[in-house]
């Protein structure tokens, strides 16, 4: 967005859920561009959020902040309430106050939960979340829909599918595996490697978001012919859109791509599937393509190699 002339206000709470220095380095890299302004406070601080938004007057808001992680939500559910529910509520209040042109909010593929139908389509049911994290993101979708209906806030929810790549979260499998393998330590492989994920390279995710900024959900009275399979609400300017590669990769193939990129064969601890996890995620990206003309397409081998190149530079390996 900075490359195309946008002025970007980046807000990060700098929580210690993972390495704060990594977040700080991200902000420092972005601050090299004069179009970027860095802010630091928590989203549950409504007063600071409102003050900052009144000052900067954003016309588009992209809400990517959340307490992430399926497993962590079992042990620390309160942090998910504070960040994902209260924080998102504050975002909605600010969007209402400002009358933004478009509010875009991150959801997750985990909202599909126990849904047996594959690939996951945006109009599939999301009634059975299997983790508290997924439940909070499902609640975000419902909260945003109600505000879109009540206050005519054009809103797009992104459902992300296993994002990976440079600057990724250290609690994600790719980061953890690389760190362990370079240290000569074994890696924990859940569900004995039989997990399947729709791995989505971060660069593709960003491109999908960038294109969706200009695809503003219309008000119910301002619509042309419906798009087949659209998730557009009948009563609100609100829709959900999957951003995923549209293919499933077995965890063992993902690990092999990392082994090839690092030139190391991992020692593997085969483990049972963790509580709250789902065995398969698979995105339908038909709606994304219809709306934007774009679908993620970076092969796992290429994306993992880019991550390894970044990791070696960032951590001097």
PLM-predicted stretches and their roles:
Residues 1-163, 212-213, 280, 294, ...:
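N-terminal Rossmann-like NAD(P)+-binding domain of SDR-like oxidoreductases, especially those catalyzing
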Residues 3-6, 41, 181-317:
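C-terminal substrate-binding subdomain of Rossmann-fold SDR/epimerase-dehydratase oxidoreductases
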Residues 20-24, 116-118, 168-171, 202-203, ...:
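Short aromatic-enriched loop/helix-cap "lid" or pocket-rim segments at secondary-structure transitions
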Residues 48, 79, 86, 125, ...:
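Residue-level recognition of oxygen-bearing side chains
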């Amino acid at each position: 967005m900075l490359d195309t002339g946008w002025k970007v206000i980046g807000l990060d709470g700098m929580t210690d859920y993972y390495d704060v220095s990594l977040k700080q380095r991200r902000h420092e890299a972005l601050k090299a561009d004069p179009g970027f302004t860095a802010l630091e406070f928590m989203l549950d601080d409504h007063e600071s959020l409102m003050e900052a938004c009144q000052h900067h007057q954003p016309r588009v808001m992209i809400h990517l902040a959340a307490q992430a992680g399926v497993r962590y939500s079992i042990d620390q559910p309160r942090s998910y309430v504070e960040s994902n529910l209260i924080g998102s509520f504050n975002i909605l209040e600010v969007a209402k106050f400002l009358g933004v042109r478009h509010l875009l909010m991150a959801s997750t593929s985990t909202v599909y939960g126990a849904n047996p139908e594959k690939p996951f389509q945006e109009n599939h049911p999301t009634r059975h979340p299997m983790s508290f994290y997924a439940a909070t993101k499902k609640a975000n979708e419902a909260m945003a829909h109600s505000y879109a209906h009540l206050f005519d806030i054009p809103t797009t929810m992104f459902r992300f599918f296993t994002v990976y790549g440079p600057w990724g979260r250290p609690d994600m499998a790719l980061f953890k595996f690389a760190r362990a393998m370079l240290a000569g330590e074994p890696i924990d492989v859940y569900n004995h490697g039989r997990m399947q994920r729709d791995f989505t390279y971060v660069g593709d995710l960003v491109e999908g978001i960038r294109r969706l900024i200009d695809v503003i959900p219309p008000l119910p009275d301002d619509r042309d012919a419906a798009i087949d399979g659209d998730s557009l609400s009948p009563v609100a300017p609100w829709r959900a859109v999957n951003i995923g590669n549209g293919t499933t990769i077995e965890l063992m193939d993902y690990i092999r791509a990392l082994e090839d990129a690092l030139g190391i064969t991992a020692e593997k601890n085969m483990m049972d599937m963790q509580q709250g996890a789902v065995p398969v995620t698979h995105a339908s990206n038909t709606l994304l393509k219809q709306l934007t003309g774009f679908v993620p397409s970076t092969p796992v081998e290429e994306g993992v190699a880019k991550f390894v190149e970044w990791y070696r530079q960032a951590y001097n390996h």
